[in-house]
A protein has these predicted regions:
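Metal-associated gating/positioning segment near the N- to mid-region
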Residues: 63-126
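Catalytic core of soluble alpha/beta enzymes
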Residues: 194-201, 205-210, 224-310, 328
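Divalent metal-coordination and catalytic microenvironments
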Residues: 9, 37, 42, 65, ...
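N-terminal metal-binding scaffold of metallo-dependent hydrolase/deaminase domains
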Residues: 1-54, 383
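C-terminal cap of metal-dependent C-N hydrolases
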Residues: 20-28, 350-352, 356, 372-405
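Metal-coordinating catalytic core of metallo-dependent amide/deamination hydrolases
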Residues: 111-126, 132, 140-253
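His/Asp/Glu-enriched, well-ordered alpha-helical/loop segment
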Residues: 238-243, 260-262, 299-381
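Conserved beta-strand scaffold positions in the cores of enzyme catalytic domains, especially
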Residues: 5, 58-62, 398
Length: 405
């Protein structure tokens, strides 16, 4: 049995439980001073304070009085893609909107072209490098979407890359099928046929492949309508894929309401989510997965998280790592942005609620007996210091499944 004992923890900060926290509960963090954590065979065996137990054969890590939290959970990324889109930055600076760039042949379609041309090996090498960087910032679990293939063989290729990474990289990954990310150029004049392709050709093969756990759709002006999104998500349910939805990022066309109606596990973005959308999500038990780094990168407003918390909607936060609207893979930056608005709830948002948004709250997201031994030792005395030191990487030591990264 492999054992790791983390001792001399100045402050251990963690949410508790195996499900998403909402309302006032989201701000309730357990703090333990002078703490220690014992991990056996990758699983947290015990957590305590005061006298450190003598554990025969254990590797001992001295936290040196620093802060320890759960490993961060990035519950929304577009990890698998070819190319980059730095050329679009100049267009944005000259006033082009996200939809302007997309409608001019840039945006998602540009990345689709590059992704189709890339081999599985090339995509895996690029994504593996990104995962290394993510882990260096304290992320230990990642959701990864397909969605830049937009053709059956290329969507399946992306999901195979995610499986390969999960099998061979230290990071734990959860796969989401997102064939309905955009209507590709070859179907622009026949979007109904593309929706049919996603639902009737891609979905059965995704189920047969057995990698994806969720189905996502981009419900937005100039992408997929509410009814098309409903069609895609209902087809996903038929094939055992739990629904997620990109909603209310640019225009509020009804995506957040649909999330509540269909019982999505999460709705993503929600920058312009209206009150009726918040009410629908609260009623449907939907987790709001907010992406503040995207708002920052787009120069957009931030999602109304406080209204969501007050309404009883659980809030998670993630990077939205992608080559266009948010080439950010640093969850610490997400924390920095979140702390400007959301105070203590941000730790729950980037750990336990993020885990719940990908159906892993029983395994990760808190420092508790029986969960995976995923920890971050921070070069910080407390949570306030992480929020305060904008732009610095304060992850001193990252521990994944009881092993030092």
């Amino acid at each position: 049995m492999k054992k790791l004992l983390v001792k001399n923890i100045g402050l251990l900060a963690t949410p508790e439980g195996k499900s998403a926290h909402r309302g006032e509960e989201q701000g309730k963090i357990k703090f333990l001073k002078d703490a220690w954590v014992l991990i056996e065979d990758g699983i947290i065996a015990s957590v305590g304070t005061g006298a450190v137990p003598a554990v025969e054969g254990a590797e001992v890590v001295d936290a040196e009085g620093h802060l320890v939290t759960p490993g961060l959970v990035d519950a929304h990324t577009h990890l698998i893609f070819g190319g980059w889109r730095q050329n679009e930055l100049g267009l944005k600076l000259h006033g082009a909107s996200y939809l302007d760039i997309q409608n001019a042949g840039g945006g998602i379609q540009s990345t689709t072209n590059a992704t189709r041309q890339a081999s599985e090996q090339e995509l895996a090498a690029k994504a593996s490098k990104a995962l290394d960087e993510m882990m260096g910032f304290g992320t230990t679990t990642v959701e990864a979407k397909s969605g830049y293939g937009l053709a059956t063989e290329h969507e399946l290729k992306a999901l195979e890359v995610i499986k390969d990474l999960n099998d061979h990289h230290r990071m734990d990954l959860v796969a989401t099928f997102m064939g309905a990310h955009l209507v590709p150029a070859e179907y622009k004049s026949n979007r109904e046929e593309y929706v049919r392709l996603v639902c009737e050709e891609m979905m059965p093969k995704v189920k047969e492949q057995g990698i994806a756990k969720f189905c996502d759709v981009f419900c937005e002006a100039d992408t997929f309508t509410v009814e098309e999104s409903r069609q895609v998500l209902e087809a996903g349910l038929k094939y055992g894929l739990r629904p997620k939805i990109h909603a209310d990022e640019i225009e509020a066309i009804g995506g957040s309401q649909l999330a509540g109606e269909i019982g999505a596990i999460s709705a993503e973005h929600l920058i312009v989510c209206p009150p009726e959308g918040i009410a629908s999500m609260a009623k449907g038990g939907v987790i709001a997965c907010l992406l503040p780094a995207t708002s920052f990168n787009l120069g957009a407003v931030f999602a109304p998280a406080r209204d969501m918390v007050k309404a009883g909607v659980p809030v998670a936060m993630a990077t939205d790592f992608n080559p266009g609207s948010c080439p950010c893979l640093n969850m610490q930056f997400v924390i920095n942005l979140g702390c400007l608005k959301y105070k203590l709830e941000v730790l729950t948002a980037v750990t336990l609620n993020g885990a719940a948004a990908i159906d892993l709250a029983d395994k990760v997201g808190s420092v508790e007996e029986g969960k995976l031994g995923d920890l971050v030792i921070w070069d910080a005395p407390d949570l306030d210091y992480i929020c305060y030191r904008v732009g610095s990487n304060l992850a001193k030591t990252v521990i994944k499944r009881g092993e030092i990264v």
